[in-house]
From Swiss-Prot:
Glycosylations at Asn-46, Asn-90 and Asn-133 are essential for TMEM35A/NACHO-mediated proper subunit assembly and trafficking to the cell membrane. This is Neuronal acetylcholine receptor subunit alpha-7. It is a multi-pass membrane protein. The keyword Glycoprotein applies. It comes from Macaca mulatta. The gene is CHRNA7. Belongs to the ligand-gated ion channel (TC 1.A.9) family. Acetylcholine receptor (TC 1.A.9.1) subfamily. Alpha-7/CHRNA7 sub-subfamily. Residues 316-469 are cytoplasmic. Ca(2+) binds at residues 42, 44, 172, 210.
Length: 502
């Protein structure tokens, strides 16, 4: 029992002695390493040889892409490693001490910065400790939220792919003093973004010569390639715009008598203007390229604007004043003949044929009316009823040998009657008959003028219907072509639709 307790106490004392010796070795090692160490001195064995620094990064998150200010915000961990000739020791002389850590400013480290930084502090990294092992290998892993300037190409927005460069290099050391070598970027810990899909982050090492110095300045450039996810913009911008474009076509289906054709066109035009303002708020104020969605909105606004102009013409045709003159011959030929035939449109009542009355030929003349004046009054009144309404539409039907009534009207003799109705003197007889004949002339002329005015108005209204139908077909085809042609012109349209809308 006493022997076992003694063994436990011996083991505990040995472990405490080992810890105390290790802490003593670390303290001694730190003193030896920083003794006569100058953090401004480049840690190489031969000053004529460059110090090789390996550089890489680990992308964790794409935090924001500011299209208007053209700034990319990312969460990145930098990875830098080099060999410090003055920070080496023999592990056997310092047992248990394999690695040591030095804070910022105590040992030398490369001054690698982001060249295209858009941050106010320029250096956005958090200065962590430098990890050093016994062979002098130094590893520096500073994390940071980087804001870099990036040219945002909005040519294919919202089906665009952006390429933002992150250029890193030493600020004060040239290629003869510091040899910067690239290692592949790490995206194993990347957190997916709701707005962007990370395509890749390839890197490239290059050297650049400046006018101040003869030596080259190496740099490592990583290109963050990302594709915009279009589901949000499709549901909030594209689909509403397509629906509004379809509403613009309803202007041509709305009857002209409703009085709302112009109002509908102006409302659709204002709706598109609101969507254009939404796009302008997020797009950069650049004249290098016009966004794809802006092109689509502009084409749609042109269609709606032209529809409003055409609607004004249609309303002018529909409400044309008959006293303003008849339709020009070329307008009648183009609209009422060619376009109406092409659109398979016919005038209202054009196919209606009045039934022919099967009666024997009756010749009614004013002479017979005059002869009937001496007859009983009922006979003369019955004949006078037809005298007043003969030729109301300005057409006089010639008598036929088989039937005396054609197209629902009596075939009257055009010789003596027309002479009387157009100012001829009635035969001598009853003066009341002359007054009645004068009233009949006035009524016939009045109805004839009304029929002519109605015919002119009907002709203009039919022309308005033809223009409406023609513009409906033309604008529908143009809208479909613009929608398919503009949106599908994006290089990755199919990929975006298959991934985001599937």
């Amino acid at each position: 029992m006493r022997c076992s307790q003694g063994g436990v106490w011996l083991a505990l004392a040995a472990s405490l002695l080992h810890v105390s010796l290790q802490g003593e070795f670390q303290r001694k090692l730190y003193k030896e390493l920083v003794k006569n160490y100058n953090p401004l001195e480049r840690p190489v064995a031969n000053d004529s040889q460059p110090l090789t620094v390996y550089f890489s990064l680990s992308l964790l998150q794409i935090m924001d892409v500011d299209e208007k200010n053209q700034v990319l915000t990312t969460n990145i961990w930098l990875q830098m490693s080099w060999t410090d000739h003055y920070l080496q020791w023999n592990v056997s002389e310092y047992p248990g001490v394999k690695t040591v850590r030095f804070p910022d400013g105590q040992i030398w480290k490369p001054d690698i910065l982001l060249y295209n930084s858009a941050d106010e502090r320029f250096d956005a990294t958090f200065h962590t400790n430098v990890l050093v092992n016994s062979s002098g290998h130094c590893q520096y892993l500073p994390p940071g939220i980087f804001k870099s300037s990036c040219y945002i190409d909005v040519r294919w927005f919202p089906f665009d792919v952006q390429h933002c460069k992150l250029k890193f290099g030493s600020w004060s050391y040239g290629g003869w003093s510091l040899d910067l070598q690239m290692q592949e970027a790490d995206i194993s810990g990347y957190i997916p973004s709701g707005e962007w899909d990370l395509v890749g982050i390839p890197g490239k090492r290059s050297e650049k010569f400046y006018e101040c110095c003869k030596e080259p300045y190496p740099d490592v450039t990583f290109t963050v390639t990302m594709r915009r996810r279009t589901l949000y913009y499709g549901l909030n911008l594209l689909i509403p715009c397509v629906l509004i474009s379809a509403l613009a076509l309803l202007v041509f289906l709305l009857p002209a008598d409703s009085g709302e054709k112009i109002s509908l066109g102006i409302t659709v035009l204002l709706s598109l203007t609101v969507f254009m303002l939404l796009v302008a708020e997020i797009m950069p104020a650049t004249s290098d390229s016009v966004p794809l969605i802006a092109q689509y909105f502009a084409s749609t606004m042109i269609i709606v604007g032209l529809s409003v102009v055409v609607t004004v013409i249609v309303l002018q045709y529909h409400h044309h004043d008959p006293d303003g003159g008849k339709m020009p011959k070329w307008t009648r030929v183009i609209l009422l003949n060619w376009c109406a035939w092409f659109l398979r449109m016919k005038r209202p009542g054009e196919d209606k044929v009045r039934p022919a009355c099967q009666h024997k030929q009756r010749r009614c003349s004013l002479a017979s009316v005059e002869m009937s004046a001496v007859a009983p009054p009922p006979a003369s009144n019955g004949n006078l009823l037809y005298i007043g309404f003969r030729g109301l539409d300005g057409m006089h039907c010639a008598p036929t040998p088989d039937s005396g009534v054609v197209c629902g009207r009596m075939a009257c003799s055009p010789t003596h009657d027309e002479h009387l109705l157009h100012g001829g003197q009635p035969p001598e007889g009853d003066p009341d008959l002359a007054k009645i004949l004068e009233e009949v002339r006035y009524i016939a002329n009045r109805f004839r003028c009304q029929d002519e005015s109605e015919a002119v108005c009907s002709e203009w209204k039919f022309a308005a219907c033809v223009v409406d139908r023609l513009c409906l077909m033309a604008f529908s085809v143009f809208t479909i072509i613009c929608t398919i042609g503009i949106l599908m012109s994006a290089p990755n349209f199919v990929e975006a639709v298959s991934k985001d809308f599937a």
